[in-house]
Amino acid sequence: MDEVSPTKHFTSKPLLPTKTPRDKAISHYVNALNSPRNVVKTEIPECGIQIIDGDGNFASTDTRERPSLKNYILSKPEFLKRGMDYNAVGILGAQSSGKSTLLNYLFNTKFRILNEVMGRSRTTHGVWMALSGKESNIVVFDLEGTDGSAREDDYSFERKTSLFSLSVCSVLMVNLWSHDVGRFQASNMSLLKTVFELNLQLFVKEETPKTLIVFVIRDREADTPFDQIERDIMEDIMRIWDSVIPPEKFINSPINRFFDFQFTSLPHYEHFYENFVEEVNLMKKKFDPKNKETYFLPQYNKEIPADGLSCFCEQIWETIKDNKDLDLPSQREMLSRYRCTEISNQIYKEFNDSIKGEMKTLKKGNIIEEFKKIMTKEIDTAIEKYKEVTERYMESIVEEIEEQLKKQLYGLVESLFERQAELMEKAIGKRVKGEFTIIRNEYALLYNKKEFNPMKYQKYSQELSRTKAVIERDWRKQFDESVPKFLAEKTKEKFNSVCKDIGIAYEDAVSKMAEVMKQHFGDYLESTIKPKITPYLEACKKDMWKNIRNVINTQFTNGFNKLEEGFKTCSNMNKDTIEEEIKKSKIDILNIIKELVIKRKTELPYLLERKFNNIFRFDNKGLPRKWEPTDDVDTLYFTARDETEDILDMYCYFRIEENDDQFKFTINYRDGDLPSESIEALPEGADEDKIILNHQERKELIETLNEFFEKGYLIALREKENSEIKYQIPLYLIVLVIFFGFDEFIAILTNPLLFILTLIIGGGIYIGYKLNLGGVAKNYIQYLLSMSLSSTMEYLRTIPFFTPLIDKIWPKDDNKDDDSTEETQEETK
């Protein structure tokens, strides 16, 4: 087979003087992983690091001799920045064939080399790794030599290391001596067969990138043409390939589907040292990605991210070591999942740390301005950082973990927003209450009982509407500035809930203002009506309720038109609600008037007695009536009583409507005693709520009035009888008095002292007569005589001699004496 010459050259990305966003993200991630908590400080050996020891143990932890592979890579930030922009090269060959020496010359590594003085035992144990190049863009693997005496016939380890190198290396060098070409074992052809078989295993589930196998012929002999050596090796390769039993999927597949081959040779290291060094330097150029003839073509790159190399190598080796089927796609997926998860966790932690300031702000009860902008920026930064660091991993896994990371970040931000929303809701509620209260306090100053103008309330109604609109606008703005896009749907209910609360507070404020306006109107109307109806209540005339109704109707017509206008302009009430409120207000005002009437119940006995006296005991001029024998006491008495009862009847019922005048609550006394059922009975059709005097109160008042009426009537009859006696003195008696008393009359006239005394006594009697005080004088004289007689008898009763006689003619009766005395005193009054 002809030599495979490179058709493309692979150009690595140059390091720029300024860091790209991806470089910054990786640097940030590296710094986080290099923190004292994540890195164990172990001295980095100059000879590279043994990643797999001779017993097959992977360098997963730090030891005294070497760091773990992870920490070794983390100590190379330049390499970490490469992402997938690096190449891996490994070398296979017999033990002590100069593999490590060749690598040191090619890549400026410092792998330990053979010291022949110490013997030709194996120098490289297991697998060693080092970074090469000024930009650390080449990973060099030095594998333990094959066919060593230490392993004897145990080929399992070299098989495992070969499979490991195939999994991670873009270029695999096979180091063999020229004089071993043609020998199956010595030329590592048996190892090549293993490589071919293992590589087919790697291709079973998914085609992996090709591997370039470079045969390095050592100790070239001048008399053997190199082309012949190349043909011999290719013939051996084809025989080996034909002997390999491929999976069914790859039957009849050519070898160049899986491998590319190149050949080179070097002179003897010791005999032709200068030539060896010169040709090695020429060969070194082919390991420069910038060279057009480079070995590192893109199709050979295994696409393992630099920051995931340690994890990938460990997973690959553990799988190989456990003799499990190696599934590179699964391993890459596992690596991607592991690294993406690790990066995701680190970014989540950084995100959590970055918003601690906002957490403290919210914890203190302070709202974060532009919450949405801040959180969106933090989330975008975190996701961008995640994408930058994970861009070389499997896209499906990166996207899957990215979604998980977003959910974590969104969950954290959502918990912060819940607190933010709680504080905003509390603040907006406080603002609504405060501003509406200020407006309410302002229109409360309008209160004046003597004046009611609903137009003044309209200003504050408009102010409430304007304030509500401003608060709703500010709430929407604040909410929009606080709600991240991913929470928009979830928070609609919260937004609408607060808007609803604002509306409820506004309706409550309007309702309270309408209530204040209604109360203002009620007080105004009360203060207007009271002075106008009080005189009617005091006058106690038959047309009292008619006059009161006229006042109420007049005031209601004017007043409630104003109130209705106020409701229309200052509230959001509809027509039916306004009518209902007007109706309630009328009822309230009528109840106030009713209470005013009820309060006068205490004065009712005085008003009724005054009414009776004004008709019965005083004449039309308001002077005390002088009863003459011709006066009709009975007719006047019944007239006074009936009119007094009419007044009582007016106060029994709240006659605010015209048809209320038909109800009667008192009865005529002329038919005898008052039956109790006539008082307790409620007139048919009467409204119990309009009752002012209940049946018990009416009963007590009627009984009291009955006594008052009877006393007045008896006094009038007595005075009339006295006047009749005065007019019944016979004429002959007057003539006899003059005839027999003529001498005494002359004696009085001739005696100045008796004359003056007679004038005084006569004048007093005349005045008493003119003033109709005869009855009073009579009663008083009777009272004095009675008291004198009673005192005399009681005194004689104390003398034992007269006691029996006095007891017979003057029995002792204290109650009678008291009653007669009381009656005499009453008549005297």
Swiss-Prot record:
Q: What is the superkingdom listed in this entry's lineage?
A: Eukaryota
Q: How does it sit in the membrane?
A: Multi-pass membrane protein
Could you say which protein family the record assigns here? Answer: Belongs to the TRAFAC class dynamin-like GTPase superfamily. GB1/RHD3 GTPase family. RHD3 subfamily.
Q: Could you list the residue ranges forming a coiled coil in this record?
A: 372-396, 576-596
Q: Where in the cell is it found?
A: Endoplasmic reticulum membrane
| Example GO molecular function | GTP binding
Q: Where does GTP bind?
A: G93, A94, Q95, S96, S97, G98, K99, S100
The organism is Entamoeba dispar (strain ATCC PRA-260 / SAW760)
Q: What is this protein called?
A: Protein SEY1 homolog 2
